[in-house]
Amino acid sequence: MPSMPFYHRPGRALRPLTARASAPAARRVETPVAVSAAEVGYAVIDLETTGLSPARDRIIEIGLVLLAPDGSTQSSWTTLVDPGASVDVGPTFIHGLVADDLIGAPGLADIADLLVRDLAGRAVVAHNARFDVGFLTQALGSLGHLSRGARIPRVCTMELARTYIVTPSRRLVTCCEAAGVPIGSHHCALDDAHASAGLLRRYMSVGRERGDGPVAWSRSLESAAAFTAWTWDEAAART
């Protein structure tokens, strides 16, 4: 388990970082080699942010769940993120966080190598992936961890909802209710990431029952295996 200072929401028990599946080796490589199909998987992510604009706003909480290609959970972690002393935390009525909650939390630059290592070789899954991937692209690109113009392979559980479940709305809570997927505290990053992972597994199950051919998530694994735009320091990811 890394010694990195992960910070969690007040009143929530610390979840230890469990052993991760191996990621493609890298020591600050500028062009990582493509990984084999056997090494890929999914990185289900949820971000809580100070607002809606990747260019202007900041990430203040990350929840990440790593899945094998069959959808089984491999590991998960979460942390609060300090956006900087002069940054307003934004809509507390949505994410439930105030400035004092983020005191002492790592900045994104402090955990970026770990985050990128865990994303590498995986298709990024999110509910409203355009939002979360937009923030990842802006934030990690500005830190030099993602090549300019690169399009992160992604799967959007919100876009796929009406193909695989019957739901009156594509909101995460509504989709989970329709799919029978448990959800913890909505807008708590790790709980929402686990909920999105549950939706993906439900879609996989429905797809198998219907005899669907290659679908969005399986094609995304091929894209993830060939994606070479990440850069990270393996030593920094372990400290």
Regions found by a protein language model. Give the residues of each.
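Acidic two-metal-ion nuclease catalytic site recognized across multiple nuclease folds
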Residues: 2-34, 198-239
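Low-complexity, compositionally biased segments
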Residues: 116, 135, 194-195, 236
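Acidic, divalent-metal-coordinating active-site segment for phosphoryl/phosphodiester hydrolysis
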Residues: 188-202
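Buried hydrophobic packing segments
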Residues: 136, 160, 196-200
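Conserved non-catalytic scaffold segment of RNase H-like nuclease domains
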Residues: 12-152, 165-187
